[in-house]
Amino acid sequence: MGTSHQVFLVLSCLLTGPGLISCQLLLPSILPNENEKIVQLNSSFSLRCVGESEVSWQHPMSEEDDPNVEIRSEENNSGLFVTVLEVVNASAAHTGWYTCYYNHTQTDESEIEGRHIYIYVPDPDMAFVPLGMTDSLVIVEEDDSAIIPCRTTDPETQVTLHNNGRLVPASYDSRQGFNGTFSVGPYICEATVKGRTFKTSEFNVYALKATSELNLEMDARQTVYKAGETIVVTCAVFNNEVVDLQWTYPGEVRNKGITMLEEIKLPSIKLVYTLTVPKATVKDSGEYECAARQATKEVKEMKRVTISVHEKGFVEIEPTFGQLEAVNLHEVREFVVEVQAYPTPRISWLKDNLTLIENLTEITTDVQKSQETRYQSKLKLIRAKEEDSGHYTIIVQNEDDVKSYTFELSTLVPASILDLVDDHHGSGGGQTVRCTAEGTPLPEIDWMICKHIKKCNNDTSWTVLASNVSNIITELPRRGRSTVEGRVSFAKVEETIAVRCLAKNNLSVVARELKLVAPTLRSELTVAAAVLVLLVIVIVSLIVLVVIWKQKPRYEIRWRVIESISPDGHEYIYVDPMQLPYDSRWEFPRDGLVLGRILGSGAFGKVVEGTAYGLSRSQPVMKVAVKMLKPTARSSEKQALMSELKIMTHLGPHLNIVNLLGACTKSGPIYIITEYCFYGDLVNYLHKNRDSFMSQHPEKPKKDLDIFGLNPADESTRSYVILSFENNGDYMDMKQADTTQYVPMLERKEVSKYSDIQRSLYDRPASYKKKSMLDSEVKNLLSDDDSEGLTLLDLLSFTYQVARGMEFLASKNCVHRDLAARNVLLAQGKIVKICDFGLARDIMHDSNYVSKGSTFLPVKWMAPESIFDNLYTTLSDVWSYGILLWEIFSLGGTPYPGMMVDSTFYNKIKSGYRMAKPDHATSEVYEIMVQCWNSEPEKRPSFYHLSEIVENLLPGQYKKSYEKIHLDFLKSDHPAVARMRVDSDNAYIGVTYKNEEDKLKDWEGGLDEQRLSADSGYIIPLPDIDPVPEEEDLGKRNRHSSQTSEESAIETGSSSSTFIKREDETIEDIDMMDDIGIDSSDLVEDSFL
């Protein structure tokens, strides 16, 4: 009974599996029943294993490798299973564990569970158990314990562990070896047996990176494929160096997949396993699984993904709306279609069979990918309109399939009345009222009538108009696609009545009313309405005329003199020119002036060539230019011209400004007499001499002259542009002797006409001897030669002279406000003179000026703070100077070529747009322009610094020539200079002097005293400027302290009259000036401020 029970128990466990606790068997037993046993060398021993099921042995040596080991089964009558292991001729290699276990409990992956006994076979010649092939390699996880398996054949043997000759402390067990935490490297075990020392071979310890948990990630590029495509799946293991990874997939049986391993060590350890299945078929659909197992620990992780393979691509669409849809007018509505497709589809929308444009703002389409093969397409109506009604179609297609869906959309529009009019039937008095309405759905039209016109504000006075009323006919509505028209006819209207048209549909009801007037009353109303309309037209016409008259541009002088500045520097107070005194010394008799041809004409006045008699001692007859207003000038314009005269009298003379010579203000129109400039304005001169410049500089490419508005191939056009500037208000070339207009005036008989007058002595620069290789070039710059050849040095000379002239104006706190090449004239000897030529320019028809209120502004020349903040300072003139440089080195080009002055232009200026370098400018010159165009005014250079910068670009001989000419000008009896001095001979008649030096001192004192008395009527209190130290005075140029003046003008508006000697000027030069009776300070007149 006991035997059969044991057999039944074993069979039950075999059938149900070893994992059930109810089938758990007792472990087999080993005889002898000991944990360990020592066996003599070369002796024999046997071990018996007894168990309730079939048992087997595990031992150090396999039966195939060792014939001295024999395992056999024995039968007994107890029903137990017995297996005997017998070893003959035992050796040290038989030392180790012997385990007896049940066969049914053992699998390939599980550890052996059973009874164990350890056998020692001491061998005096072999202290350590022989090692296997892999025993010398010890793999351990980082910071984990490990066993170095140097086992001894005798349990009594003492063993030590060494690492590179160093003793390593560690716990030792003769059945396992040394146990502990070891660093990476070689280790040797050493034992001494009966005086003999035994050493093992090296044990190499390797540390591998591993974690307690496997971090496994699976990635499939896609999960849907077509037949013939390649399936790619990857699994990545992180932070583990030794991992066993197995793939399970549908094609594994056919060995179809290709596996690859890639190791990535940076920034962290990563093992990437890739499975590739080429030429996939439908059979390759299914689950793809990767299972990773750690090499040093019993840790496993698994990931899987489902992949489907289709014979061909597919498209499926699922709309979320019906085939008939309606939206309300101005409603925002989305129509969503769910799409599933592979490969990636192309989705398009059509309206009434026409493709919708993607950039429409009222109807938009959008496609979003939600999953690998799932998409969502949206058609969005933004504020739906009536014309949005129609048939909409979505088409989804790829290379293998196509699907579409169409729906009809209607826009529901509330009823509205488009028109309500009455038609008269002639003298019979009959009238027909037509009411046109629209809406979706089409509205219905009803009629109502109110016979008591005064009570029509009350709804109870209205009655529905029946179709069977006598003398009234109601017609059926005429229906269109979205409009309907209803009519009602009245045979005769004898009194005023009101008719109401009602249009209604499901969305709204609207009404409109119309009065029907009897024919007699209508004629009376028509006459009254006509009179009223005529009266309104007259009133509006008068208003328009007044506005036009007030907006008519008025002449005003652009120059302004700064009186004071607010502490924050954002508000400037300018001197009122009318409050300035006018010195009668400037008055010139009218009978001494003969007027000739017109040099320039504008909307307000003109400039005329004239001949002045007795203007100076050295030149009794002088050619001059005369400014005057037109006979139609208004009083405000006369006042502006007088203001210009007063400002010029107080500025004083300078070589590089158009100097005032005299004026006629009494007994007739105001004449301002100024210097006559031989070559006219600078723009004209640059245009005219462009070809000569290009011939001297062949390295400059002759590009299209678009910036000039010229066609280089059309000589007639170019000639016209150069020679016809009188018509558009520019200063005419004074060398021309063509037939021009003349101003009739008294002509003195005893003198020749203006054409025979000799040139002014002050217009002819002094000659000088050739001193260097550059003298010939400099001589062409400042000479009396009529040659008009233009060179790069000429352009630099113009640039320098304008800077000097503007430096002088800045020293007087004078802001020009219209600095441009058209306001720069060229005198004999190519002397540049700055002027304000707005009086003789037709600015209303000049494209360079833009209308703003009642004035015209040169916007392209203006600084940003002047354009946007109406702020004009010397530093805003610096900006204009940069534009002027661009004009000069583009040979008269128009700034910002091709750009209109509009909102785009203003936005570009605000955003920092600047012009590129003109063709003929050097990098140094362009750098000056860029500095002048700094958006922050305080960072722009002053005219003093600009003069110094340009001066350094010119030959040294040029500087000396210029200073000599400037000095000669100030020493001459030029009317502009002479009138600012007191005639010493007249002032001190009868006084005897010991020497000329005493006479000069008294003359200077008299001049200063007279100056103070002349200006005492108008003195503006401004803070003084610190005097220049004597040490610095020797290194500065002879100027009116313009640098100090310009910089301080930003804060105080003050100026200084300190005399500063130039670098290239000698003390002898100043003494020579003193000898001729000129105070050194007279070189730069004291500001009237």
From Swiss-Prot:
ATP binds at L599, G600, S601, G602, A603, F604, G605, K606, V607, K627. The keyword Cell inner membrane does not apply. It is an enzyme of class 2 (transferase). GO terms for cellular component: cell junction; cell surface; cilium; cytoplasm; cytosol; external side of plasma membrane; Golgi apparatus; microvillus. Residues 550-1089 are cytoplasmic. The modification Phosphotyrosine is found at Y572, Y574, Y720, Y731, Y742, Y754, Y762, Y768, Y849, Y988, Y1018. It comes from the Eukaryota. Induction: Up-regulated by growth arrest. GO terms for biological process: adrenal gland development; anatomical structure morphogenesis; animal organ morphogenesis; cardiac myofibril assembly; cell chemotaxis; cell migration; cellular response to amino acid stimulus; cellular response to reactive oxygen species. Disulfide bonds join C49-C100, C150-C189, C235-C290, C435-C501. It catalyses: L-tyrosyl-[protein] + ATP = O-phospho-L-tyrosyl-[protein] + ADP + H(+). It is a single-pass type I membrane protein. The keyword Lipid metabolism does not apply. Interacts with homodimeric PDGFA, PDGFB and PDGFC, and with heterodimers formed by PDGFA and PDGFB. Monomer in the absence of bound ligand. Interaction with dimeric PDGFA, PDGFB and/or PDGFC leads to receptor dimerization, where both PDGFRA homodimers and heterodimers with PDGFRB are observed. Interacts (tyrosine phosphorylated) with SHB (via SH2 domain). Interacts (tyrosine phosphorylated) with SHF (via SH2 domain). Interacts (tyrosine phosphorylated) with SRC (via SH2 domain). Interacts (tyrosine phosphorylated) with PIK3R1. Interacts (tyrosine phosphorylated) with PLCG1 (via SH2 domain). This is Platelet-derived growth factor receptor alpha. It comes from Mus musculus (Mouse). The lineage of its organism: Eukaryota, Metazoa, Chordata, Craniata, Vertebrata.
